């Protein structure tokens, strides 16, 4: 399955909302909530004696991906395009791989 096919399938189960702002708000709030659930799994493993549950983590990461797909759609983007833009940005920022010096001293306007 391609990234865009996954996005299309995710959108089949998205709520019908009144406008793009509501879609984006729902997507970003959901993304934040699901990311919180993922970090909670790790927190419990590291600090509360729970075993690390990779299957549960994978399911929460799937929920993160679902909300990411919805958020991207709300602003009119396909996930493949967003992923490509991000990789292009990182290649430009770190042409020879990650460099902590370049990370600490990024060029003006480098978002």
Residue ranges and their predicted role:
Residues 1-111:
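Flexible "arm" and connector segments at domain edges
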């Amino acid at each position: 399955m391609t990234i865009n096919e996954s996005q299309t399938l995710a959108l089949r189960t998205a709520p019908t909302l009144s406008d793009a702002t509501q879609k984006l708000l729902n997507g970003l709030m959901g993304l934040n909530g699901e990311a919180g659930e993922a970090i909670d799994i790790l927190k419990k493993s590291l600090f509360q004696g729970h075993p690390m549950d990779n299957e549960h983590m994978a399911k929460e990461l799937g929920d993160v991906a679902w909300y990411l797909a919805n958020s991207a759609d709300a602003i009119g983007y396909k996930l493949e395009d967003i992923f490509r833009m991000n990789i292009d940005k990182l290649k430009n920022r770190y042409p020879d791989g990650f460099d902590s010096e370049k990370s600490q001293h990024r060029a003006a306007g480098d978002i």
